[in-house]
């Protein structure tokens, strides 16, 4: 066994028919954690249902269905390897909830793979003004996903045309530039997710294709395939040296064990013996044990989905959306209000002070009031365009003071990125995204401190 590979996370974005599932399925299938038996089982089922031509996407559909039914699916199924990395596919979107998931969940995305359908008409549909492609790319950029790979898919339907590929690269470059990406740092790969061209091996169908190049801090990087491009992702820096922040996804009551909050460590580490404070509930208690995938862990690090056992805390005290933090190291607090840079994506009317949509920030889902529009700014440069605007509309960016309707814990994006970005939901869709600039925290004394926390403090 060599040294464990570095983990990176990718999010696959693009229009619903761009072939994301097939492309992702193909990678997982060929370099992934799905064992041969499962593959054969899936293939047999797909063939019986006459879905033979759909096998890679079928693999993904099966995994999704199992994931949605809450079968704790072996997470290896969503992983594949490159020479350098162990890659986890966070979400292959195509659904309304994707945007929400992306904001609340992509703290972890190190790179976005934008899949674009090369077929005539398809590309245009995906990139049209209201296209999902645009929205996904804008989101990825706004949420700090700075690395991008563009996979121009379905090249087989263009008869492997070099002209079509070049045309798409040109259009897409203009498009991603508007979003904020620098096309020179992006690898453009012509592929067929279904036939496998330029996925792992160089395609013989496109002799004109000489490979991709991209600029990085270290210099120019070159490669041929999509796998090469993923392998050329710049390694992420994980925030384990920051204070602990762990937003709770759920809180379980487990007979014989007690209360077990579950969530992903976003920053810092969590380990047994630590005294944690939950905000905004303002409850402090000792962590008895930490586990992941039903195994005890010495410590949970950023990116780990963990369950941890806490004593003397009832399921009523803490809930989804609460944030666990180290009581001795910058403990999390309730936000009385916060200022954020908000980008309006798609709202049919105007938004003014008093607007009170639901914010999805990390795992919290709480209505917040736009108390004050402070200034309208240029989305790309951040320069002020207008002080105290009366209204903002789609396409605008502004600095807003927000006041939560219920106790909520958020942080500034600079200090704790995953807790500093949010989606604004209204009319069953994401109408805006935001990045938190500053938080006005309430200092509540007299929170509940459990006996086990007091004992742990005495031991120290």
From Swiss-Prot:
Region feature G1, mapped onto this chain? 14-21
> Residue ranges of region G3?
91-94
Xref: Pfam families:
GTP-eEF1A_C (PF22594), GTP_EFTU (PF00009), GTP_EFTU_D2 (PF03144)
Q: Which residues carry this modification: N,N,N-trimethylglycine?
A: 2
Using the UniProt annotation, give all residue ranges assigned to the region (G5).
192-194
Please list where the region (G4) is annotated: 153-156
This protein's source sits in the domain of life called Eukaryota
The segment(s) forming the tr-type G domain are: 5-240
Which SUPFAM superfamilies does this one have?
Answer: EF-Tu/eEF-1alpha/eIF2-gamma C-terminal domain, P-loop containing nucleoside triphosphate hydrolases, Translation proteins
N6-methyllysine PTM sites in chain numbering: 3, 30, 316, 390
Segments carrying the region annotation (G2) are: 70-74
Ordered alphabetically, the record's keywords are: Cytoplasm, Elongation factor, GTP-binding, Methylation, Nucleotide-binding, Protein biosynthesis
N6,N6,N6-trimethyllysine: modified positions: 79
Annotated residues for binding of GTP? 14-21, 91-95, 153-156
| Cellular localization per UniProt | Cytoplasm
| Record PROSITE patterns | G_TR_1 (PS00301), G_TR_2 (PS51722)
Q: Which GO terms describe its cellular component?
A: cytoplasm
Q: Which family does it belong to?
A: Belongs to the TRAFAC class translation factor GTPase superfamily. Classic translation factor GTPase family. EF-Tu/EF-1A subfamily.
**What's this chain's function?**
This protein promotes the GTP-dependent binding of aminoacyl-tRNA to the A-site of ribosomes during protein biosynthesis.
Return the PANTHER family for the record: TRANSLATION FACTOR
Record-given protein name:
Elongation factor 1-alpha
């Amino acid at each position: 066994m060599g040294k464990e590979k570095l983990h990176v996370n990718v999010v696959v974005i693009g229009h619903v028919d761009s072939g994301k599932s097939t492309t992702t399925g193909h990678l997982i299938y060929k370099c992934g954690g799905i064992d041969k038996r499962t593959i054969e089982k899936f293939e047999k089922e797909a063939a019986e249902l006459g879905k033979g031509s759909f096998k890679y996407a079928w693999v993904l559909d099966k995994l999704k269905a199992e994931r949605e039914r809450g079968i704790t699916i072996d997470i290896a199924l969503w992983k594949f390897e490159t020479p350098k990395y162990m890659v986890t596919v966070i979400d292959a979107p195509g659904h309304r909830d994707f945007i929400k998931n992306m904001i609340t969940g992509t703290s972890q995305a190190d790179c976005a793979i934008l899949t674009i359908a090369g077929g005539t008409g398809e590309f245009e549909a995906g990139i049209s003004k209201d296209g999902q492609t645009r929205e996904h790319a804008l989101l990825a950029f706004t949420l700090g996903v700075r690395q991008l790979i563009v996979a121009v898919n379905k090249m087989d339907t263009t008869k492997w045309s070099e002209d079509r590929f070049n045309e798409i690269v040109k259009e897409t470059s203009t498009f991603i530039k508007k979003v904020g990406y620098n096309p020179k740092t992006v690898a453009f790969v012509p592929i067929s997710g279904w036939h496998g061209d330029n996925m792992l091996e160089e395609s013989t169908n496109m002799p004109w294709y000489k490979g991709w190049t991209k600029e990085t801090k270290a210099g120019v990087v070159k490669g041929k395939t999509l796998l090469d491009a993923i392998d050329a992702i710049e390694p992420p820096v994980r925030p384990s040296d920051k204070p602990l922040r762990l937003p709770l996804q759920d809180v379980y009551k487990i007979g014989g064990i007690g209360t077990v909050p579950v969530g992903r460590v976003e920053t810092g580490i969590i380990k047994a013996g630590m005294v944690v404070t939950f905000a905004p509930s303002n409850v402090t208690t000792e962590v008895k044990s930490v586990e992941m995938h039903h195994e005890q862990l010495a410590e949970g690090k950023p990116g780990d989905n963990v369950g941890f056992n806490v004593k003397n805390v009832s399921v009523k005290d803490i809930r989804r959306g609460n944030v666990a933090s180290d009581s001795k190291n910058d403990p999390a607090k309730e936000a009385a209000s916060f200022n954020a840079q908000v980008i309006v994506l798609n709202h049919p009317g105007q938004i003014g002070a008093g607007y009170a949509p639901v914010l999805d920030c990390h795992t919290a889902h709480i209505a917040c009031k736009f108390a004050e529009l402070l200034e309208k700014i240029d989305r790309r440069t951040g320069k002020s365009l207008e002080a105290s605007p009366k209204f903002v509309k789609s396409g605008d960016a502004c600095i807003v003071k927000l006041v939560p309707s219920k106790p909520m814990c958020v942080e500034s994006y600079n200090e704790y990125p995953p807790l500093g970005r949010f989606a604004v939901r209204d009319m069953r869709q994401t109408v805006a995204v935001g990045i938190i600039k500053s938080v006005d925290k309430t200092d509540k004394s007299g929170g509940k401190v459990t006996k086990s926390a007091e004992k742990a403090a005495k031991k120290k």
